[in-house]
Every structure is written in structure tokens, then in C-alpha cells.
């Protein structure tokens, strides 16, 4: 395989597999998109609709239009945007609810920074596609809330009630602990700010991007292991022995993307070198049989192959190859794509990607769509490959 063949195959996969799957889920009766498809590929039109999935679908169709320029994609983005504003937006207290029922009535009014970040990411992309001032105004309102309500002197508070009173950070916590701060949420704030900056070129946002990159360099990156810490206390001290290989490799290319828009040459050089070290460590430690292991927690390695981890690994290793010209990264890209085609893509006519494979590559009976299983990772993988090659 060479890069031209890779690009051609991924373009075909995006257009013939991923896009039609998500277009089919447009909910014409209740708004938004059907938010649950079981392992049996049966959609549940009565399933609750989540902020993360709704925002990611908005981002996906907006980015499709911005990159591939097909008018149909705007219609699908509009559909997601209208439901997001009608059902998730808290007009009284501002911000967006975590979850609504299938008709759009709020059933979980918590505000989580992770969810607000994806609203910001989606609205910024939608504004680029449509130039609708309302969408940009909302994006800037969310940005202002994040900076004025969530931020403190050592990072960002993450979970709140509907009136923005801080709560225990339950939504993104794992491994039997409750964290105050998470690398995952901070990464998606950086990602969202980068997208907002490229929609506005507001210089104040550029400064916040730089501050977040410094936070990654000084508090989140572990120079002893070349991994990223996962969970922190409120002072940004790491609180668990855990490595998320998927987040490590995803962070390398998202941070490299953010580095393009700051002016601090010393930071650009240092962080770019760190990102390459992280990519090399992930390749060395977690790349096995053409695919990426999931995580290591308290010394125990989880060898399941998760859909989003493989998608982010392909982009991350392609980015590392384009920076370094080291053949080992390109080899990993080609092997990952073969693995994805052979094992992760659901070859049933109505299927998309399996959520998870066990260490023998047998699909786990998990949904193909739910509040987290979305077109953001694998759809973006396709779009990044098409853009970069």
C-alpha cells in the first residue's frame, strides 16, 4: 500500500459506509438524530439524546460540508443545530444540558465542561459552514462561561448543576475514583478553542490556547514516562497510575494542530518534540498486531481494541510520520488501516464500526450508536487523511 491508495480507500469508506449510516439516523419525527442503535443494528427512536453525541454530529456534518462542499451536508448539520438550540440550550442560566429525552425534554440538567467543549467545537465548525451569526454568538457565550465560571488559578472546574454551582466530577471519572480534573476534558477544551480561534481569529483566544498548552507541558505530561497523566486533584496533582494510550496519541496531533496558531516559538519547539516522544512511546509500548491496546491502569493492561482508539492512532501516527519522516510511523498507519478494514468495520450492510473487539478480535455485543459512540472519531480520521495526503 502507498499513501495514494490509503487516501482513495478511506475516501470511499467515508462516502459509502460512514456518511450513509449517520444520515439514516436523522429523526424526522422528533428532531435531532436517533441516539441508540444496538449490536443487532436495530435503532431505538425512544432513546435519550445526549449533548456530546448531538454536538459531535453537528461538528461532523459541518466539517463534511467545509471540506467536501456537498450541499446535502448543510441540511444534516442544520437539523442537528436546530435540535441542539431548541432542546439543550438553557436560556435562563446559559450553557447546555447534559441529556434530553427522545422528544427533546431535559432529563439531566447538569452542565459539564466536557459537553460544553463539544458544543463549542460543533458551533465553531457550523459557523464556518454557514456564517450564521447566531451560532458564533452562542459559541462565544460558551467560551465566556468557560473562562469566567469554570476556570480557576490551576485549571478548570468540570461539573456543575443547571445553575452553575460546582458538583462532584462524576460524569468523566473512572477506575473507582472521583477526579477533580481530567486530561480528557482539558484536551477537548484545547481542541474547541483551536476551532473557535480559526473561526474568529480573536487574539484573546490565542492566549488561552497557549495557556492550555503550557498546562499540558507542565502538569499533564510526565517527562519520566513520556505519557500523559489522566486524572488530577483540584491542584492538578495526578491521583492514579493510569495510561490511556488512545488519549496519548490523540493529544499529540490535536496539540500539534493548536501549536500552528500560537506565536511562542520556544513553546512550539518544546511541545512539538514532546508530542513526538509521546507518539514514539505509544508505538513502542501499545502497538501490537497492527492495532493499539486500550489502556494500562494500576499496572494492568487492557488489550481490548476500542473503535475510537484505532481511529485516533491512525491520525496520530500519520501526523508523527509527516513531522519526522520516520518509516515506523507510516508502517503503523498502513497496518492500522488493514486492521480496521479486517476486524473493526462491521461488514453487515447496515453496520458501521464495532465499538470494541476483545483481544482475539471478536466484537463485543455493544451498541453501534449511543451517547458516546459517534461519527466524530472515525469520521474525522477519514477527513484528516483526505486533507493531509
UniProtKB/Swiss-Prot annotation:
This is Cellobiose 2-epimerase. Its EC number is 5.1.3.11. The lineage of its organism: Bacteria, Pseudomonadati, Dictyoglomota, Dictyoglomia, Dictyoglomales. Optimum pH is 7.0. Monomer. It comes from Dictyoglomus turgidum (strain DSM 6724 / Z-1310). InterPro entries: 6-hairpin_glycosidase_sf, 6hp_glycosidase-like_sf, AGE/CE, Cellobiose_2_epim. Catalyzes the reversible epimerization of cellobiose to 4-O-beta-D-glucopyranosyl-D-mannose (Glc-Man). Catalyzes epimerization but also isomerization for beta-1,4- and alpha-1,4-gluco-oligosaccharides. Can use cellobiose, lactose, cellotriose, maltose and maltotriose. Signal peptide: none annotated. Keywords: Isomerase.
Amino acid at each position: 500500500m502507498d499513501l495514494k491508495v490509503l487516501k482513495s480507500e478511506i475516501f470511499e469508506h467515508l462516502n459509502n459506509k460512514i456518511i450513509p449510516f449517520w444520515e439514516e439516523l436523522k429523526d424526522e419525527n422528533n428532531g435531532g438524530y436517533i441516539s441508540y442503535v444496538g449490536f443487532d443494528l436495530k435503532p431505538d427512536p425512544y432513546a435519550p439524546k445526549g449533548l456530546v453525541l448531538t454536538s459531535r454530529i453537528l461538528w461532523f456534518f459541518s466539517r463534511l460540508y467545509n471540506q467536501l462542499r456537498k450541499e446535502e451536508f448543510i441540511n444534516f448539520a442544520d437539523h442537528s443545530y436546530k435540535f441542539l438550540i431548541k432542546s439543550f440550550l438553557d436560556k435562563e442560566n446559559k450553557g447546555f444540558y447534559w441529556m434530553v429525552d427522545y422528544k427533546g425534554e431535559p432529563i439531566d440538567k447538569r452542565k459539564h465542561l466536557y459537553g460544553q467543549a463539544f458544543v463549542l467545537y460543533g458551533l465553531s465548525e457550523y459557523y464556518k459552514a454557514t456564517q450564521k451569526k447566531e451560532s458564533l454568538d452562542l459559541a462565544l457565550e460558551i467560551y465566556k462561561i468557560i473562562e469566567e465560571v469554570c476556570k480557576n488559578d490551576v485549571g478548570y472546574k468540570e461539573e456543575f448543576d443547571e445553575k452553575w454551582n460546582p458538583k462532584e466530577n462524576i460524569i468523566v471519572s473512572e477506575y473507582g475514583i472521583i477526579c477533580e480534573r481530567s486530561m480528557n476534558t482539558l484536551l477537548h477544551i484545547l481542541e474547541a478553542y483551536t476551532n473557535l480561534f480559526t473561526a474568529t481569529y480573536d487574539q484573546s483566544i490565542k492566549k488561552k490556547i497557549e495557556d492550555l498548552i503550557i498546562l499540558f507541558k507542565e502538569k499533564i505530561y510526565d517527562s519520566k514516562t513520556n505519557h500523559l497523566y489522566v486524572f488530577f486533584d483540584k491542584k492538578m496533582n495526578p491521583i492514579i497510575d493510569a495510561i490511556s494510550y488512545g488519549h496519548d496519541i490523540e493529544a499529540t496531533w490535536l496539540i500539534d494542530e493548536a501549536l500552528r496558531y500560537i506565536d511562542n516559538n520556544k513553546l512550539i519547539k518544546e511541545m512539538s518534540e514532546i508530542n513526538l516522544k509521546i507518539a514514539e512511546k505509544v508505538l513502542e509500548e501499545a502497538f501490537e498486531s497492527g492495532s493499539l491496546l486500550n489502556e494500562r491502569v494500576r499496572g494492568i493492561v487492557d488489550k481490548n481494541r476500542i473503535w475510537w482508539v484505532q481511529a485516533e492512532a491512525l491520525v496520530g501516527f500519520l501526523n508523527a510520520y509527516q513531522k519526522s519522516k520516520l518509516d515506523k510511523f507510516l508502517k503503523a498507519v498502513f497496518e492500522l488501516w488493514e486492521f480496521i478494514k479486517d476486524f473493526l468495520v462491521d461488514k453487515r450492510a447496515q453496520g458501521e464500526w464495532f465499538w470494541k473487539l476483545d483481544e482475539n478480535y471478536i466484537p463485543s455485543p455493544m451498541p453501534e450508536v449511543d451517547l458516546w459512540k459517534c461519527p466524530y472519531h472515525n469520521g474525522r480520521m477519514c477527513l484528516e487523511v483526505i486533507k493531509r495526503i
